[in-house]
Amino acid sequence: MRSRRFFNDLAEELRELPEEVRIIAIDGRCAAGKTTLAARLVKELGGDVIHMDDFFLPPALRTPERRSEPGGNVHYERFLTEVLPNLRSGRPFSYRRFDCSRMALGEEMPVENNGYVFVEGAYSCHPVFGDYMDRRVFLDIDGKTQEERIRKRNGEDRLQDFLQLWIPLEEAY
């Protein structure tokens, strides 16, 4: 019930934003429901979703220093050049998503950019991006539920990666 009220209140707040390109960043802890919330908001309000997972850092740029930074696994430079300059234009654009199965850039992802644009994923509100969004949403989750969701989504083997690497970096962020 609480999540339905949260969703309805958020959707109503977003409807009240001025009618131009409305940019909403959905950040939060892993497995907190960022992707699910973005999909529900698009279904309710329309718009585009840009996934921060599409900006995974390519292997050639992974240095120990970069990987030790909170958010260092995000290819900020590409997000800053391919997405941010285009968000307020009101014109369609595209960016290339990172394909983790090939560890290389993959298909072009079109963004209609004529209403709501939801930028979802961990580090979508990172200070390196500045204050590009009209609204910030941060989703929290308790540790037990987080572990259960990661185990279900990624499997037991990958859960250990999250517990030892990704969650500590997100907590530092």
Q: Model-predicted segments: where are they?
A:
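Small-molecule kinase domains that catalyze NTP-dependent phosphoryl transfer to phosphate-bearing small molecules
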Residues: 104, 126, 155-173
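Extreme N-terminal, non-catalytic leader segments
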Residues: 1-24
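P-loop (Walker A) phosphate-binding loop of NTP-binding proteins
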Residues: 29
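ATP-dependent NMP and nucleoside kinases share a basic, alpha-helical "lid"
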Residues: 104-153
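Conserved lysine of the Walker
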Residues: 34
